[in-house]
Amino acid sequence: MLDNVLRIATRQSPLALWQAQYVKQRLEACHQGLRVELVPMVTRGDVILDTPLAKVGGKGLFVKELEIALLENRADIAVHSMKDVPVEFPEGLGLVTICEREDPRDAFVSNRYASLDDLPKGSVVGTSSLRRQCQLAERRPDLVIRSLRGNVGTRLGKLDNGDYDAIILAVAGLKRLGLESRIRVAMPPELCLPAVGQGAVGIECRLDDDRTRALLSPLNHDETAIRVQAERAMNMRLEGGCQVPIGSYAELINGELWLRALVGAPDGSQMVRGERRGLPQDAEMLGISLADELLNNGARAILADVYNGEPPA
């Protein structure tokens, strides 16, 4: 960190820049005299737009370049959408702050139809997510699900051009970009379980940078951090990346942590679901035990097919 200047590594998409600006404003409000600068950059996931994410392969498609900037001291922190953050970090880096979660649900977006159930047989639905795909296919096997890549504006443009009858996007992203009016239905977790960490913004930095960590401390939201910890522990045990058919959602209700999760075959033909309840301080163990239950109930074979290789140990 240079004098009183803190540099944020961020992707260049409108949503990523919103998240970085949000963190910048929060930091400057908490620390008088601190100047925060954005360092926009392009990631591999931003460049490869003609291939479904699940086929691009690899973890950290949207974060690796930002992490290199941290390691090379070209930036002090990196701001991420938590659903894009791998469960493992390069040596010397770590996730130190998780901001308060926005609405984690998925949004049904259509210009012609009011809900998923209103779609006629054979309707074309766009999504880049195997998690969304498997849940849609299970509920509506009569739909045609096609890949949809690009930033939020690009995806909405393809819907408006008639390429799709409906698309599925994150409620949080639409709200942050002032596009809440495009949401026809916010899909409850019972209908479409969110991605791990969906709706939360995470901040990564060098673990030995005590000054920066102290500056970030006021931005951490304890309840969100506990919920996301449970979801990510489950995902780590499953060895899941952000492009696999895994959904997970934790809630804190009356002091009890309730974790739900699923693993599904992309075509919706198989779905393994489970849930656990426990104490907030046991978030990590709750996630691990639920993952083990899923693996033993059929998730191991589903994930092996998805990875076309070895199932999780």
Curated annotation (Swiss-Prot):
UniProt key word Transferase: yes
UniProt catalytic activity: 4 porphobilinogen + H2O = hydroxymethylbilane + 4 NH4(+)
GO biological process, one term: protoporphyrinogen IX biosynthetic process
SUPFAM superfamilies reported for this sequence: Periplasmic binding protein-like II, Porphobilinogen deaminase (hydroxymethylbilane synthase), C-terminal domain
InterPro entries: HemC (IPR000860), Porphobilin_deaminase_cofac_BS (IPR022419), Porphobilin_deaminase_N (IPR022417), Porphobilinogen_deaminase_C (IPR022418), Porphobilinogen_deaminase_C_sf (IPR036803)
A GO term for molecular function: hydroxymethylbilane synthase activity
Transmembrane regions listed in the UniProt entry: none
Pathway: Porphyrin-containing compound metabolism; protoporphyrin-IX biosynthesis; coproporphyrinogen-III from 5-aminolevulinate: step 2/4
Cofactor: binding details: Binds 1 dipyrromethane group covalently.
Modified-residue entries (S-(dipyrrolylmethanemethyl)cysteine), positions: C242
Pfam name, any one: Porphobil_deam
Alphabetic keyword roster: Porphyrin biosynthesis, Transferase
UniProt-listed PANTHER family: PORPHOBILINOGEN DEAMINASE (PTHR11557:SF0)
Free-text function comment from the UniProt entry: Tetrapolymerization of the monopyrrole PBG into the hydroxymethylbilane pre-uroporphyrinogen in several discrete steps.
Family: Belongs to the HMBS family.
Subunit composition and interactions: Monomer.
Protein known as: Porphobilinogen deaminase
Lineage of source species: Bacteria, Pseudomonadati, Pseudomonadota, Gammaproteobacteria, Enterobacterales
Gene, per the UniProt record: hemC
